[in-house]
Amino acid sequence: MEPHFFFTVLWMLLMGTSSTYAQEIFGYCRTPDENSGTCINLRECGYLFELLQSEEVTEQDRRFLQASQCGYRNGQVLEKHFCFTNVQICCANSRMRNQQPQWGNHPQPTQTTKPTKRSGTKLLPMAPNCGENFGDRVVGGNETTKREFPWMALIEYTKPGNVKGHHCGGSLINHRYVLTAAHCVSAIPSDWELTGVRLGEWDASTNPDCTVGKNGRRDCNEPYVDYPVEERIPHPQYPGNSRDQLNDIALLRLRDEVQYSDFILPVCLPTLASQHNNIFLGRKVVVAGWGRTETNFTSNIKLKAELDTVPTSECNQRYATQRRTVTTKQMCAGGVEGVDSCRGDSGGPLLLEDYSNGNSNYYIAGVVSYGPTPCGLKGWPGVYTRVEAYLNWIENNVRA
C-alpha cells in the first residue's frame, strides 16, 4: 500500500467519530461486537492493522475501526490532532491470544501446584516487619519522596523487536513475590512477554535517583534492581472476558530472592482482625504509582493521592450504568475530579496506614482493577480488588 493512501485511510477512520464505543478502563475495553479486549496501540493489534493496510477497506470495515478506537492519551481524545503512533484501538483478546499465550521460543512460566492449605502463612511478613515508610509526610503533595512506599514495583514487558516497557505496577509482599492484577498477566497481547519486575525505582528517567537537600548536599538512593519473573500466577477464576473483572488478582514469583534495603521493602497484607470484611469507610486510603497502564503513563516520578473509600452500594449504582456489578470482593475509592487513580498504576496498590501494638505500618487494602476513562472523573470512583478477601488464596500459592 502506498504510504499516502495508508494515512489518508487512517485519517478518514479517525475523523468519523467524536465519541468511541470502545471505552478504555485501565486497558480493559469492549469491542463494537461486544467482545472483551485490550486498548493497545494500533500497530500492535495485528488483525486490525492488517485490515487498515488492505486496499479494499469497506464502509463496514471503516465503521468498525472507528468504533474500535479507545484513544485517550493523557486525557485527550485522539481526533483531529493525532500522532499515528498514539492511535489506540480496542483489540479483541480472542483475536490476540489463545487461552494460554504463546511466547514463541521463550520458556513459559508455569502454574503453581496448589500447596498445602495456608502453607505460605509463615513466609509472609507481619508488622512491624513490613509496611515501613521512610518518606517525609507531605500532606497534599502529588509527588512522593525518594523513599516513600519502598514496596512499589514496575512490571516489565518485552514486545516485538525486543522493545521493553513498564505497563503495570505491583507490590512486593515478601522476598520472592509481587502482588498485582490478573489483567496485567492474562489480558495482554499475545506477542508481549511479561519478563521482569523493577524494584527500588522513584524517578524512571534517572538511575540512581538523587535530590539536593536544603543544605546543598546531594542525596541518592541505591540504583534500582530488575528481577526476572520465574512464575506468573493469575487467580484461576479470573474471567478475562467479563465486564466485572472479578478475581482480578495475581502473584508473580521472582527468580531470585529480593534483598531488602531502605529502598526495597515489603508491604503488609491486611491480616489484622479489624481489617476483616472492612472497606474502611471514613478512613483515608492512598493510591500511589507512576500512572502506568497497558496503554499510557502519566509521570516519570512516583506519585500519590489520598482518597476516600466509597460504599459498595453507591459504587454499584454508578457502574450499573455500564452494566457492571461491584461485589463484596471488590472495593471502591476516589471519584474526586482530577485525582483518583490517575496517580496509580494498573495492578498497583491501594494503601491503608493502620496501627497495631503501637506500630504504624502500611497495608495493601486493594489492587487497582479498573475505573473511568479519562481517569479522575467526578463521581466515578476507581474499583479495586479487595486483598483481604484473597488472603487464603495468597497464602496457599506462595512457597519458599
Swiss-Prot record:
Its EC number is 3.4.21.-. Residues 1-22 form the signal peptide. Disruption phenotype: RNAi-mediated knockdown is semi-pupal lethal, with 50% of pupae dying at the late pupal stage or during eclosion. Adults display impaired melanization at the site of septic infection (septic injury) using either Gram-negative (E.coli) or Gram-positive bacteria (M.luteus). No significant increase in PPO1 activity after septic injury using fungi (B.bassiana) and bacteria. Survival and induction of antimicrobial peptides (Dpt and Drs) is not affected after bacterial or fungal infection. Aseptic wounding has no effect on survival. GO terms for cellular component: extracellular space. Serine protease which plays an essential role in the melanization immune response by acting downstream of sp7 to activate prophenoloxidase (PPO1). May function in diverse Hayan-dependent PPO1-activating cascades that are negatively controlled by different serpin proteins; Spn27A in the hemolymph and Spn77BA in the trachea. Regulation of melanization and PPO1 activation appears to be largely independent of the Toll signaling pathway. SMART domains: CLIP, Tryp_SPc. The active site is at H183 (charge relay system), D248 (charge relay system), S346 (charge relay system). Residues 138-399 form the Peptidase S1 domain. This is Melanization protease 1. Coiled coil: none annotated. Keywords: Calcium, Disulfide bond, Glycoprotein, Hydrolase, Metal-binding, Protease, Serine protease, Signal, Zymogen. Residues 28-91 form the Clip domain. It comes from the Eukaryota. CDD domains: Tryp_SPc. Residues 98-120 are annotated as: Disordered. Glycans are attached at N142, N296. The clip domain consists of 35-55 residues which are 'knitted' together usually by 3 conserved disulfide bonds forming a clip-like compact structure. Ca(2+) binds at E201, D203, T206, D209. InterPro entries: CLIP, CLIP_sf, Peptidase_S1_PA, Peptidase_S1_PA_chymotrypsin, Peptidase_S1A, Ser/Thr_Proteases_Immune/Dev, Trypsin_dom, TRYPSIN_HIS. Disulfide bonds join C29-C90, C39-C70, C45-C91, C130-C268, C168-C184, C210-C220, C315-C332, C342-C375. PANTHER family: TRYPTASE-RELATED.
